[in-house]
Regions:
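Extracellular S/T/G-rich loop segment that most often corresponds to the catalytic His/Ser-adjacent loop
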Residues: 105-190, 194
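C-terminal subdomain of the subtilisin-like protease fold in secreted/lumenal serine endopeptidases
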Residues: 55-61, 171, 194-227
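Active-site-proximal beta-strand/loop segments in catalytic clefts of secreted hydrolases
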Residues: 1-5, 25-29, 60-64, 89-94, ...
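Subtilisin-like serine protease catalytic core
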Residues: 1-37, 53-56, 69, 106-110, ...
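Substrate-binding/access-modulating region of protease and related hydrolase catalytic domains
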Residues: 9, 27-109, 120, 166-182
Length: 227
């Protein structure tokens, strides 16, 4: 979604920044499960190897409901931000509890992303289906419903909100949520950096917010903006 080149899809599906390189850092198990300790270790690996692999943007389509792990994740992403690396994090999905931006999206050193679906625009003043509506709103919203993504051979269909009906073909599947919206913003950040490689993260964030459009019918244009 962020930088797929569409090779496996014969050009039918491509990411926002298809010429960007990908450095995969494994912090989850084969079933997509993990913990904050592994997440922090992964972020520290990026700190140590950012120059070697020319890492400019970090996409974090992860989150936790455990606020006790806030500090180590917050410190790790803010360190990356200070190093000049743009960090883009999913702002979470509603689950019946009080809404808030979960770690690591709660940090000031990130661009936090919520997801919107087409119907949300016409349900004002309701909030987007896939984004938390209280406490702190995401910096940006991006499309997050039925997004086509790569299908892993180990994809666990026994987990909630996963269905074989979403399979597109042997290589692709559609999924929904903030984790799917986040790579779209990461790709947009990569495009900005391709034009101006030395731009600092705060300026990338400012440019994205500046170019985003007010999300019609949701609160005010100042706090609800979408790409």
């Amino acid at each position: 979604m962020a930088c797929g080149n569409g090779h496996n899809a014969e050009g039918r599906y491509a990411g926002v920044a298809p010429e960007a390189g990908i450095v995969s850092v494994k912090i989850l198990d084969r079933y997509g499960q993990g913990n904050s300790t592994h997440a922090v270790l992964g972020l520290r690996w990026i700190m140590d190897n950012a120059h070697k692999y020319n890492i400019k943007v970090v996409n974090l389509s992860i989150g936790t409901n455990d606020r006790k792990v806030n500090l180590p994740l917050k410190e790790a992403v803010e360190r990356l931000w200070q190093m000049g690396i743009v960090v883009v994090a999913a702002a979470g999905n509603p689950d019946g509890r009080n809404g808030y931006r979960p770690p690591p999206a709660v940090s000031g050193g990130v661009i936090s992303v919520g997801a919107w679906e087409d119907r949300s625009y016409f349900l004002a003043p309701a909030f987007p289906l896939f984004s938390r509506e209280r406490d702190v709103l995401p910096d940006l919203w991006a499309p997050g419903e039925d997004i086509i993504s790569v299908l892993s051979p180990d994809f666990d269909f026994t987990l909630p909100n996963r269905s074989r009906k979403n399979i597109v073909d042997e290589n692709y599947i559609t999924m929904s949520g903030a984790s799917m919206a986040t790579p779209l913003i990461s790709g947009a950040a990569a495009l900005l950096l391709a034009e101006n490689p030395h731009t600092r993260p705060a300026e990338i964030k400012r440019l994205l917010l500046q170019k985003a459009k007010p999300f019609g019918g949701l609160l005010t244009a100042e706090v609800c903006r979408t790409i």
